[in-house]
């Protein structure tokens, strides 16, 4: 009896979370109408890439980003097909060549299309470390990067 009640409670909570997440994702700008201000584009990453920062970002990536972006950042996450997503391969430097750190930070913070915003859940420094991690994925096909903070905006 207790187990049944626990299972029902877990299912209800998961449904509530999923519906809330769906509403938040729907509020995000569609990929086609996405416009980032010049000030946000020009933002420079104030957080120097470090093994500790990348490890912390990797944890968040693992439970928040990996399901869509894939464990290696290749865009082959487990929900891509079922959600009908078109994902980019972050390991390819050409994918990120035209994006500044400020743009990546903005997308992580505000979300985009079906991607949920992390701004209200993840501290700013950790979001900048996620930018460093995304740059590191492209730097060595999923490896580490020397310093994303020094990467100039295009």
PLM features per residue range, with description:
Residues 78-82:
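Short cysteine/histidine-rich zinc-coordinating motifs and their immediately flanking basic loops
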Residues 69-75, 94, 109, 119, ...:
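Detector for the c-type heme attachment site
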Residues 106-113, 119-148:
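C-terminal capping alpha-helices of c-type cytochrome domains
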Residues 1-9, 19:
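Bacterial N-terminal signal peptides that target proteins for export
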Residues 85-102, 117-127:
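Electron-transfer interface patches adjacent to heme c in soluble/periplasmic c-type cytochromes
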Residues 14-22:
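C-terminal segment of classical bacterial N-terminal signal peptides
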Residues 28-60, 151-154:
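Electrostatic cytochrome c docking/interface patches
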Residues 51-74, 104-110:
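Sequence/structural segment immediately N-terminal to covalent heme-attachment motifs in c-type
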């Amino acid at each position: 009896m207790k187990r049944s009640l626990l299972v029902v409670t877990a299912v209800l909570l998961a449904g509530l979370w999923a519906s809330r997440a769906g509403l938040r994702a729907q509020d995000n700008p569609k990929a086609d109408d996405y416009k980032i201000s010049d000030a946000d584009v020009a933002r420079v990453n104030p957080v120097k890439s470090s093994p500790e920062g990348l490890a912390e970002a990797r944890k968040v990536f693992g439970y928040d980003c990996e399901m869509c972006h894939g464990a290696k950042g290749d865009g082959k996450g487990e929900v891509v097909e079922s959600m009908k997503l078109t994902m980019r391969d972050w390991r390819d430097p050409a994918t990120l060549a035209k994006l500044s750190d400020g743009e990546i930070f903005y997308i992580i913070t505000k979300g985009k299309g079906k991607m949920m915003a992390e701004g209200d859940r993840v501290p700013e420094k950790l979001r900048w470390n996620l930018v460093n991690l995304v740059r590191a994925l492209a730097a060595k096909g999923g490896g580490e990067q020397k310093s994303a903070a020094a990467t100039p905006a295009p």
